Regions:
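FIC/Doc superfamily catalytic core
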Residues: 1-207
Length: 207
């Protein structure tokens, strides 16, 4: 498996990028109200955590205590991304730290790449995609990170990262949750997180 994803800026995508840029600039022009923004961001992160859990079916298949822990961990990981002690750049360490926070007290493999083969199954239990073997994970992730050039528009970088990360599927569990937070991290770095007030997971669940 090689990381060599290509994309094409169609008229529709170009228009969407322009719309995002207009909205970003409009929000940047708004006066900063730290107290109100902090409250709204807290509500937004909480909703993002709940929608992220719903995307994965958490709450339907887990005991109540485990379900609460899953949601609490997602919330903690999202808060970490926005904290002063959060990561400053995307690298292997950031990915492992995110996974460690998301699977904290839920899996002995929290923060560790999988050491066995894995596959993606459909609802009928049939394997529809076989993930790369464990020895290739670290190098494939490094390739993916290197491919995200700063010349690529931020929203597209976030999409490429999410797509590539899920294809590599570096962990036995939690890949979807980590992938969505990594997308949020890229958008934040590129200035497209809209001050942390948008709920990406709500859109993903609906579409």
């Amino acid at each position: 498996m090689q990381i060599n994803y290509r994309y094409q800026l169609t008229p529709n995508i170009t228009q969407l990028l322009q719309d995002l840029e207009v909205n970003r600039r409009l929000i940047d022009l708004l006066p900063s109200l730290p107290h109100i923004e902090h409250h709204l961001r807290r509500q937004s992160i909480l909703k993002s955590s709940l929608f992220s859990a719903r995307i994965e079916g958490i709450g339907n298949a887990l005991p109540q205590d485990a379900s609460k822990r899953e949601i609490s961990n997602i919330l903690s990981a999202a808060n970490w991304l926005y904290s002063h002690s959060g990561p400053r750049r995307l690298n292997i360490t950031t990915i492992n730290q995110l996974h460690g926070r998301i699977l904290r007290h839920l899996s002995p493999d929290a923060g560790q790449f999988r050491s066995q083969p894995s596959a993606i199954f459909n609802q009928a239990g049939v394997a529809i995609y076989f993930t790369p073997p464990p020895p290739q994970i670290r190098e494939l992730l490094s390739q993916l990170i290197r491919s995200l050039h700063s010349s690529i528009p931020g929203p597209i970088r976030a999409s490429l990262l999410h797509f590539g990360f899920e294809k590599i599927h570096p962990f036995l569990d939690g890949n979807g949750r980590v992938g969505r937070l990594l997308s949020t991290f890229i958008l934040k770095q590129a200035g497209y997180d809209f001050r942390g007030l948008t709920i990406l997971e709500e859109y993903l669940e609906a579409n």
